[in-house]
Amino acid sequence: AVEAFKLARKYGNAADKLFINDYNLEYSIDKCKGLIEYVKYIESKGQKVDGIGTQMHITINADKEKIATMFQLLAATGKLIKVSELDVAAGLKPTQSDLQLQADMYKYVAEMYAKYIPAKQRYGITVWGLIDSKPDSSWLPGQNQGLWNLEFTRKASYSSFADGLKASK
C-alpha cells in the first residue's frame, strides 16, 4: 500500500484525495482498529492517506453499538470518512416489520455518520444497489436491500434514509 500511495501521488492529479477502503469494519471493531493502525504505518513511511472508506453491507439486525463505535474510531483519525458502499439486507421474504427495520437501519446509519463524523471530515455515503436484487442477481440474489423495490417504487427505507441524511445539515 505504501508504494501504491507513492505512485498515485506521483502520477495522479495533485488535487486527488487518496483513500484506503475496507469492509466489515462495523462487524469487527478489531479490524477497524487494525485498519487505523495500518493508515498510521503508511503515513510513518512518508505517504499521506487523505481518507478512510468503509463498505457497509449490513442486515436489519446489524449491531448498532458497533456501528456507532466504528464511526467514533474513524472520526478520531481526523481523516476524511466515506461510507463507500451501503446496503441493508432485509431477507428473501421480508415482512412489513422487516421492511420497517430496514428503514430504521438506513436512517440509523445516516444519523450516526452525521453525529460522529464532523462536517469537515464527511466525504459522503454511497448507496450500493438502489433497487432490490433480482433472484438471478450476482449480488445478494433475491434480497430486498434497496431503497426501491423491483418495480422502482420507493420503499420506506428511501424516506427514512433521506430523513437520516437531514441530520447532517
Question: Where in this protein do the model-derived segments appear?
Answer:
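Aromatic-lined carbohydrate-recognition surfaces of secreted/lumenal glycan-active proteins
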Residues: 1-32, 82-85, 124-130
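An active-site-proximal structural segment forming one wall of the substrate-binding cleft
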Residues: 1-11, 34-45, 104-116, 120
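Extended low-complexity acidic/polar segments
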Residues: 3-12, 41-46, 51, 58-59, ...
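Aromatic- and acid-rich polysaccharide-binding/catalytic face
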Residues: 10-11, 15-22, 35-62, 67-92
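A generic structural signal for short
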Residues: 26-27, 58-59, 98
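Aromatic-rich peripheral "rim/lid" segments of glycoside hydrolase catalytic domains that contact
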Residues: 65-169
